[in-house]
Regions:
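Catalytic binding pocket for nucleotide-activated donors in carbohydrate/polymer assembly enzymes
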Residues: 233-273
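Catalytic donor nucleotide-activated moiety binding site of glycosyltransferases and closely related
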Residues: 156, 173, 177-210, 265
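Short, charged, surface-exposed secondary-structure boundary motifs
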Residues: 45-51, 164-165, 213-221, 254-264
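Active-site and donor-binding regions of nucleotide-sugar-utilizing enzymes
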Residues: 1-83, 232-235
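Short, charged/polar "capping" segments at the starts of alpha-helices
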Residues: 19-21, 46-47, 161-164, 194-200, ...
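A nucleotide-sugar donor-handling region in carbohydrate enzymes
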Residues: 47-49, 53-153
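Short loop/turn segments at strand-loop or loop-helix junctions that form parts
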Residues: 13-16, 36-44, 149-161, 190-193, ...
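Donor nucleotide-activated moiety binding/catalytic core segment of transferases
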Residues: 192-234, 238-239, 262
């Protein structure tokens, strides 16, 4: 593909991926000035290398980096910060003002245009992706449901996070239930890796395909209120500025780096459960 296109700019959503790095390094054969461009990929664009367990950070940034460089070759680069590899020159971010100083000092930072994600041409492309993400369990879902207006759109965390931070499914359902009382149309989306339907809701609630990226839904769905966990709400606050955005947060996580980031995004309301 690169042999035929000979691109002058290559975009990627995660510059730590081997495919992106190899594509840029290979393209230099045709265009020495080829530009690697990073597209906002969520919290990793703003939080400098978050690891839930310290041993993962040690393995990821030492042994894993060394082994992959030996296996792939000297072109492979791994950095803690997304957008930070040597193959990236430009970074296109939802919130350029929140970019880490390390990124601002080394890369050219540009704002992403929200209107692009609302364009009809892109929506047609996204509609085709919806069908690609559909699984047998989503047989009752239709693309038309993306264009309906909802009172509340709930983006659910993984059940393991619910058990760890919210005291279990019952407590979490009670916390979410406060925002659903008296509401007409409600939609929910489970975490992509969720295997259990733990959310307590009736048949009137629209359940979006779990495998569908939340960012695609935020490009379509109109909802008066979006409730969910911190990471997904960054995209919601950017793509749905007209909606009330609520981050339901368990107490005791004030020092969480991702939550600290969300607090810097003005439209997002932090509500402790």
């Amino acid at each position: 593909l690169i042999d035929s296109l000979q691109p002058v700019r290559i975009f990627g959503g995660n510059d730590r991926r081997e495919e992106f790095q190899y594509a840029v390094s290979y393209a230099e054969k045709y265009t020495p000035q080829v530009v690697g461009a990073y597209l906002d990929d969520g919290t990793g664009s703003y939080v400098n290398g978050v690891y839930l367990r310290k041993w993962r950070a040690i393995v990821d940034l030492t042994a894993d980096r060394l082994l992959k460089r030996v296996f792939y070759g000297p072109w492979y680069d791994k950095q803690r910060l997304l957008g930070g590899t040597r193959w990236v020159k430009e970074c296109y971010l939802n919130f350029p003002d929140l970019a880490p100083e390390e990124l601002k000092s080394r890369k050219d930072i540009f704002p992403l245009e929200r209107e692009v994600f609302r364009a009809d041409s892109l929506r047609r492309l996204l509609e085709s992706l919806v069908d690609a993400y559909r699984t047998p369990s989503d047989e009752d879902f239709s693309v038309a449901q993306l264009y309906q207006e909802y009172d509340v759109f709930v983006v659910l965390p993984h059940s393991k996070a619910v058990a760890r931070y919210f005291g279990g499914e019952k407590s979490y359902n009670e916390a979410i239930g406060k925002y659903l009382k008296g509401k007409g149309k409600v939609a929910v989306k489970y975490h992509p890796r969720e295997s259990r339907f733990y959310f307590d809701c009736d048949a009137s609630v629209t359940v979006f395909p779990a495998s569908l990226p939340a960012e695609i839904l935020f490009s379509f769905v109109q909802s008066k209120c979006v409730v969910g966990d911190s990471s997904a709400l960054l995209s919601a606050a950017w793509l749905m500025p007209e909606s009330r955005t609520i981050c339901l947060c368990p107490r005791g996580l004030d020092e969480n780096p991702i939550l600290s980031l969300v607090k810097r995004v003005p439209p997002v309301e932090i509500v402790y459960s």
